[in-house]
Amino acid sequence: MSEEIIRLVNVTKEYDGVQVLDNINLYILRNEFITLLGPSGCGKTTTLRIIGGFENVTGGDILFEGKKINDVPPYKRKVNTVFQQYALFPHMNVFENIAFGLRIKKVDNKAIYAKVLQVMELMNLKGFEKRNIDSLSGGQRQRVAIARAIVNEPEVLLLDEPLAALDLKLRKEMQLELKRIQQRLGITFIFVTHDQEEALTMSDTVVVMNEGKIQQIGSPIDIYNEPKNVFVADFIGESNILDGVMLQDFLVHFHGRRFDCLDKGFSANEEVDVVIRPEDLKLVAAEEGMLTGEVQSVVFKGVHYEMMIQSSEFCWMVHSTQMEEVGNEVGLRILPNDIHIMKKVKGD
């Protein structure tokens, strides 16, 4: 079983009386790739900055290896940070940028040379030692920034949306590269992003945040397949979300009819939210469908078609490799394991 390295206990943070973190409780394991995911203003970057020591908590505690570090300054914490703006030194070449932290620590030149070359090889920067920062591409600069952080051998690396400035193709490549580096180094990565694909691609654990609160913690598969509430279901991928009534265990009513499902533990006739992913809806002939509807629009998305299908009570988003023409009447089949039931949150 993995060892816990960081724990946040009842952490709150206020700016000018406005609460931006509300009672955050979270533990992070050694050698884990964990992602804080959420929309702008959800508190994910504030959480990262608190772990790094760049922000103080209003309430609660930060524990590192079981010891309280609330008052420990950033430079004394066993963490390094890669910011969205890489903050590289333009007057230094690549080698000296990476070596900077080691020189501050007064590491001897022989050790600096060996460590920097080792990290440059890991980051696929071999041969770039004397290159000026201004001559590098965005992806190369990002590699230098990460190399500068990991050469100091931190126990935890904090990454604040480091891929945000890269183009789509390079961003996808760097997602896999970061995961490879983390596995090779065996250190804890805490990654912040608003990009769901990044979180699902790289992470061992995803922490979904909204309005200063943790909404759900789980593996990428759990977060996607078993969202805890409507926010998570809507934020992670696409979803069809309907009002329903849980009649009894394994039986739910929505869209004017009853459906078998796999959920239990709700009160009889409890109002619930019903979530069905677009890729889980099966297109069939109209006479074979559990529901029928008319195709309103069709958009080719590369690996599938996205169709909007208007039934009697709802406009369904459907993802399918099978294309239907606009105006066609089609049937939809919904299987029990494709239906996700969740408790309604007050205000829904």
Curated annotation (Swiss-Prot):
Catalyzed chemical reaction(s): ATP + H2O + polyamine-[polyamine-binding protein]Side 1 = ADP + phosphate + polyamineSide 2 + [polyamine-binding protein]Side 1
Class in the EC hierarchy, top level: translocase
Record-annotated ABC transporter domain positions: 6-236
Domain of life: Bacteria
Record membrane topology: Peripheral membrane protein
Keywords, alphabetical: ATP-binding, Cell membrane, Membrane, Nucleotide-binding, Translocase, Transport
Single annotated GO MF: ABC-type putrescine transporter activity
Binding of ATP, residues: 38-45
Quaternary structure annotation from Swiss-Prot or TrEMBL: The complex is composed of two ATP-binding proteins (PotA), two transmembrane proteins (PotB and PotC) and a solute-binding protein (PotD).
Entries under NCBIfam families matching the protein: MMSYN1_0197, potA
Protein name listed in UniProt: Spermidine/putrescine import ATP-binding protein PotA
Organismal lineage: Bacteria, Bacillati, Bacillota, Clostridia, Eubacteriales
